[in-house]
């Protein structure tokens, strides 16, 4: 039998430096990525290094609630 797919969920990752800095004067928004994670393997909040087009560098993107 096929296993249920309830362990893998879709999450939003948001740039922490854009949010913390209150969005710089030259930036026009907040970078967000959509990805999936396995709830059983990663029960805590997910944090990944991603490129932020508003900060023009690689920053930590943390999981947020939908």
UniProtKB/Swiss-Prot annotation:
Organism of origin: Vitis vinifera
Superkingdom assignment: Eukaryota
Protein name as catalogued: Large ribosomal subunit protein bL33c
Keywords, comma-separated and alphabetical: Chloroplast, Plastid, Ribonucleoprotein, Ribosomal protein
InterPro entries named in the record: Ribosomal_bL33, Ribosomal_bL33_CS, Ribosomal_bL33_sf, Ribosomal_zn-bd
GO annotation, biological process: translation
Principal subcellular localization: plastid
GO molecular function: structural constituent of ribosome
A GO-annotated cellular component: ribosome
Protein location: Plastid, Chloroplast
SUPFAM superfamilies found in the cross-reference section: Zn-binding ribosomal proteins
Record family assignment: Belongs to the bacterial ribosomal protein bL33 family.
